[in-house]
Design a protein with these regions (language model features):
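Paired small-residue
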Residues: 68, 79-88
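Helix-to-loop junctions at the C-terminal end of transmembrane segments
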Residues: 40-53, 138
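Residue-level signature of mid-helix packing/kink "hotspots" within the transmembrane helices
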Residues: 35-43, 127-128
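Intracellular juxtamembrane helix-capping segments at the cytosolic ends
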Residues: 94-107
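Interfacial helix-cap and linker-helix signal at transmembrane-aqueous boundaries
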Residues: 12-13, 48-49, 133-142
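Structural signature of the two symmetry-related core transmembrane helices
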Residues: 56-71, 148-151
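Helix-breaking motifs and short loop linkers at transmembrane-helix boundaries and internal kinks
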Residues: 74-76
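Short amphipathic helix-loop junctions that connect adjacent transmembrane helices
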Residues: 6-25
């Protein structure tokens, strides 16, 4: 979500026109919706994981997140964009808890702290690299390419997880 974050206010302002105060309020509401749905799914994904394998959920959540990013770009108005951000938050909220659980259970107990540390470090680096990349992509090719490239990353992740699911 952080990769799209820096361009979201600009994209919404372009979509709406209008004064900065209204845009800021709407952006805040949309970010809240995405965050709330992400928290909701993160807290409840364990129930789903009791019925469906974690790799399968990761594949589906990654693919759905990719589709949702494309749909966000295609939304004709700001409130449908907000709705799609909510759906994206929901699918995205499943990914980190499951990925961390799979990582933690795949390594011996004595290496678990190190692996979780690396995972957290890379996630935090992504929180920096994502916005930098999206800003550069938006500057070079426009806002639409940020949505498409983010979707591509999630599709790629879904493919990698699918190919490696037997060893997960």
């Amino acid at each position: 979500m952080t990769g799209i974050g820096p361009i979201l206010p600009l994209y919404i302002k372009e979509m709406m026109g209008g004064d900065a105060m209204a845009v800021a309020t709407i952006v805040g509401i949309i970010i809240f919706i995405a965050g709330a749905t992400s928290v909701t799914s993160s807290l409840n994904v364990s129930r789903l994981a009791k019925r469906i394998s974690m790799p399968r959920i990761l594949i589906i959540a990654s693919f759905v997140t990719g589709v949702n990013f494309i749909l966000q770009y295609l939304m004709p108005e700001v409130w449908t964009l907000g709705f799609m951000r909510g759906l994206t938050g929901f699918s995205l909220g499943m990914i980190m808890p499951l990925a961390n659980t799979i990582l933690a259970s795949a390594v011996p107990a004595e290496k678990r702290t190190m692996v979780v540390g690396f995972s957290t470090s890379f996630a935090l680096m992504g929180n920096v690299a994502g916005p930098m990349a999206s800003g550069a992509i938006a500057m070079q090719w426009g806002y639409g390419m940020v949505f498409w490239s983010t979707a591509f990353c999630f599709f790629l992740a879904a493919c990698v997880i699918y190919r490696k699911r037997k060893i997960i």
